[in-house]
């Protein structure tokens, strides 16, 4: 209610998009007519904004208020495992082209640019690889592999060991026992595991690790043909800067 009150007067509408056995929350902010009239030829008419690991559609569409011009309609949505969808019990799924296509179908959009924020930087790549209606890609910023967020805070010598463990989380009982204890010493890890359970609907850390293994750009190599703008931070707390080379290779 507070968000809607703050946005009073904007050409912004809420939508409930049927998906699976539930609904995806979406928000659409119509283009500024003057900006659209002055936009160069070839400017996309629609920009779809993809959410993050712990975001809501309201949060991400507010990001668009900082755009210097708005020549396109902006659509932000909570996909499975995100925001309002997660609260309703709809778990995260790796085939991100499916909710993306559902959103484009609902609004009758034949072609759209797509921007992904944080974890959305991976999701937008997955959608682009399998949804040709995505015409342009912005990863703000890049995310090659979701599991990097668990290993990056570790000292460099320990990362290969951690990679091996989370890449093959067996025996499950040992992984579960270790990850019940480790969060006591790291508030960051405790939050990540709590949020991961919330997104996936899974209770055991070993199950979460196996599920998160699906979120990697490795199988997308050669499938993304759209123009891509990839941003990277050299002090990102979740994404190793050296992953930029892996992203380049995938593209």
Q: What function would you assign to each model-found segment?
A:
Residues 130-210, 231-232:
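Hydrolase active-site cap/lid region
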Residues 53-65:
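The serine-hydrolase catalytic nucleophile loop
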Residues 202-220, 226:
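Active-site nucleophile elbow and catalytic-triad environment of alpha/beta-hydrolase enzymes
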Residues 67-84:
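Conserved alpha/beta-hydrolase
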Residues 224-225, 230-232, 236:
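Short beta-strand/loop motif that positions the catalytic acidic residue
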Residues 59, 89-113, 122, 126:
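Alpha/beta-hydrolase active-site loop
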